[in-house]
């Protein structure tokens, strides 16, 4: 009786089975690596979007803080008394004098001095509207526009020390938007004052020399603009 020869036919299939499993494992690992790489890229994109959203939220919160600050003085635009406050004889009661609002300041250094002068005048005549430092800062910020308004937003954050410090806010505003021409004029004034002071001191020295009879007064270069002043005698230097 002839036995069926199945062992030789099954051996190639058994040998191919481990190779197929190995290929499946390799394919699975490759797929996992690709998936992991894609997830990492997606996570990086999400982190970038989160950072952008955080920045946008901070900007919105800063603008909201600015709007809330402006809303703290609801009567700032009402300068003259309302009609209901007119008395029966048609006259208005004694109140603070009507004062026009300061012109908005957008960051032009040449207009800063005039803007601050208008602010001082308004706050003097409308002092009852500004009981504290925060109200003063809030009103000043409400008159800023453009670049100056953007500059003020960080200083209106809850943790900013300038939010409740009017003089400090003014100092920082002046430091940021000071006029170069105004600074040059002040430097020239200081230089001229120093020169005038030197002339007065030399004139006093001349009078002392004349009273002591030690000789003529030395010429100061500023008096004729032609030659430098000669050296003073030893006795004059000791006076």
Curated annotation (Swiss-Prot):
Q: Does the keyword Mitochondrion apply?
A: no
Q: Which UniProt keywords apply?
A: Coiled coil
Q: Which top-level group of life is the source organism from? A: Eukaryota
Which region ranges are annotated with the description Disordered? Answer: 82-106, 214-239
- Miscellaneous comment in the UniProt entry for this protein: RTL6 is one of at least 11 genes called Mar or Mart related to long terminal repeat retrotransposons. They do not correspond to functional retrotransposons, but rather to neofunctionalized retrotransposons genes.
**Entry keyword annotation includes NADP:** no
Signal sequence coordinates: none
Stated name of the protein? Retrotransposon Gag-like protein 6
Biased segments, Low complexity type:
228-239
List the biased-composition ranges (Polar residues).
Answer: 82-94
From the UniProt record, list the coiled-coil ranges: 29-69
Please name the Pfam families in this protein's record. DUF4939
Q: Which family does it belong to?
A: Belongs to the LDOC1 family.
